[in-house]
Amino acid sequence: MIKQRTLKQSIKVTGVGLHSGEKVTLTLRPAMPNTGVVYYRTDLNPTVAFPADPNSVRDTMLCTALINEQGVRISTVEHLNAALAGLGIDNIIIEVDAPEIPIMDGSASPFIYLLLDAGIEEQNAAKKFIRIKEYVRVEDGDKWAEFKPYNGFRLDFTIDFDHPAIGKDVRNYEMNFSAQAFVHQISRARTFGFMKDIEYLQSQGLVLGGSLDNAIVLDDYRILNEDGLRFKDELVRHKMLDAIGDLYMAGYNIIGDFKAYKSGHGLNNKLLRAVLANQEAWEFVTFEDKEQVPQGYVAPAQVLI
């Protein structure tokens, strides 16, 4: 049987909030089978819980934010969510003493190290997957994202920025998902932004924690980071990272073929909602026999950094 996974022990880290610029303490705790992914704002009294749910994603400007019925939010969850998807963690309690998850270095890599340091253990309950059964597509102008059936999790993402530093040869990335592929090919890709946009946003009191330490920054002509890029196509790899995190907002790893053109947090969420709203388009599956599970989902906890 392919089993659910959680952490072996709790672990804590301190970082900076991307939007507030303030110190944030993040604590990750084990959870019982069938708990799912649950975020908690511990700075509020009483503590407010945000179960991962695509219908709770009510703001996708600049990041993915969960907002409850009372208007309370927790922001910038997508990179941590991507790390959970990458390692196949089904059940976890995530506590944060601020309105946002710390940005760390702008990628999912610090969260991967944190989760592996805590340790991952299997639980005595069958792991559920969402299997795509029918073609589903959403569009927004010239942007689009789609799912179709596939026995695995395949991703194909294309960006299109008119910028001298983003050539046509680095605008597309394709990957057959596995824990190893995610850790080595995707998790280290950092978020990015354009200097003119960052200056405007900071003048509006936003992205106050943004810096060259946690983002790739481009001016009109070049990349400003002294150390350059981690991959020549790091920007499109990061957009794939975002998509993996956004699609894991359902709380289950997906079996299907995902393809997107110029998609972002909003369209990723719209696609996930469209899939789940159509009962004919998907189904829950479990695997009693490890021989039957798609190759990319075999033993995702066994990752070599």
From Swiss-Prot:
The active site is at H265 (proton donor). It catalyses: a UDP-3-O-[(3R)-3-hydroxyacyl]-N-acetyl-alpha-D-glucosamine + H2O = a UDP-3-O-[(3R)-3-hydroxyacyl]-alpha-D-glucosamine + acetate. GO terms for cellular component: membrane. One of its GO terms (molecular function) is UDP-3-O-acyl-N-acetylglucosamine deacetylase activity. It comes from the Bacteria. Its cofactor is Zn(2+). Zn(2+) binds at H79, H238, D242. The keyword Zinc applies. Pathway: Glycolipid biosynthesis; lipid IV(A) biosynthesis; lipid IV(A) from (3R)-3-hydroxytetradecanoyl-[acyl-carrier-protein] and UDP-N-acetyl-alpha-D-glucosamine: step 2/6. Belongs to the LpxC family. HAMAP family: LpxC (MF_00388). Catalyzes the hydrolysis of UDP-3-O-myristoyl-N-acetylglucosamine to form UDP-3-O-myristoylglucosamine and acetate, the committed step in lipid A biosynthesis. NCBIfam families: lpxC. This is UDP-3-O-acyl-N-acetylglucosamine deacetylase. It comes from Haemophilus influenzae (strain PittEE). The lineage of its organism: Bacteria, Pseudomonadati, Pseudomonadota, Gammaproteobacteria, Pasteurellales. The gene is lpxC.
